[in-house]
Amino acid sequence: PLAVNFALNEGRFTTACGSLGLCRAAVDVAARYIRQRKQFKRRLFSHGIVQHLFATMLTQTRSAQLMCFSAAEYRETLHPAMINQILMAKYVASKAAVDVAGKAVQLLGANGCHADYAVE
């Protein structure tokens, strides 16, 4: 049972960190796109709703990052609350990955479903 729990926790931690990577990738693609693309003779980033969506993406990504860093620290020191911290990091990061990727698709519009942009 101990080996199984160890493997499950490592899997959860890996899932959390992978989800954080997905968040970062979606933010990077969206940032490049909204800085370059123009709509109504203005860059997308100058529109309030775009700024709001992007700020939300950054906030969710940062939250996932902090949870993953905290879980890594607990894991490294074998802190008694390590399992709970890993579970919380997995929850926050995986939820953020879904939300951030969805917002990236929204910001890219029809291009968000195109394979060249890799956010879907």
What is each model feature region?
Residues 1-3:
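Long, acidic (Asp/Glu-rich), low-complexity accessory segments flanking structured domains
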